[in-house]
């Protein structure tokens, strides 16, 4: 009987440690975004999509905007401003922007929507990842450093 109580206590205690790890890792995307924007002298609310170094973000933003407002993309989204053969997705499928479409339909769509949506999706993903994998503190530290150093994740 004593042995069973100890085992149950141990399992329950590990669950709270895993929860703590998952919450800490879930905050990482937001913290990295805050650090990156602070290094640029801005806040997350001042991220302006059209002035992006790459043009893909605006391209996807306009596709989602058309889908949210009209049910399908409006405009020319093919290569060299050509029109796609079917619908207006060119070489891309609607699956690529599907999470943004759902976000836009539920919460509305503006220039900050992709940024907030990406942070929320990365936060949920990090939480679920740590909850399922249950990494050690050392592994969690390594993941944190690697995520922080990979600026493409932080940028998006």
Segments and roles (model prediction):
Residues 1-44:
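Start-transfer (signal-anchor) and selected internal transmembrane alpha helices
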Residues 106-107, 127-142:
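Transmembrane alpha-helical segments of multipass membrane enzymes and assembly factors
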Residues 90, 94-97, 110-125, 144-156:
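Aromatic- and kink-enriched transmembrane "portal" helix at the membrane-lumen/periplasm boundary
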Residues 27-39, 124-132, 150-153:
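Residue-level signal for alpha-helical transmembrane segments in multi-pass membrane proteins
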Residues 51-54:
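Juxtamembrane membrane-water interface segments immediately C-terminal to a transmembrane helix
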Residues 38-46, 56-86:
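Extracytosolic helix-loop segments that constitute the early lumenal/periplasmic catalytic or substrate-binding loops
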Residues 19, 23, 116, 141-142:
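Hydrophobic alpha-helical transmembrane segments
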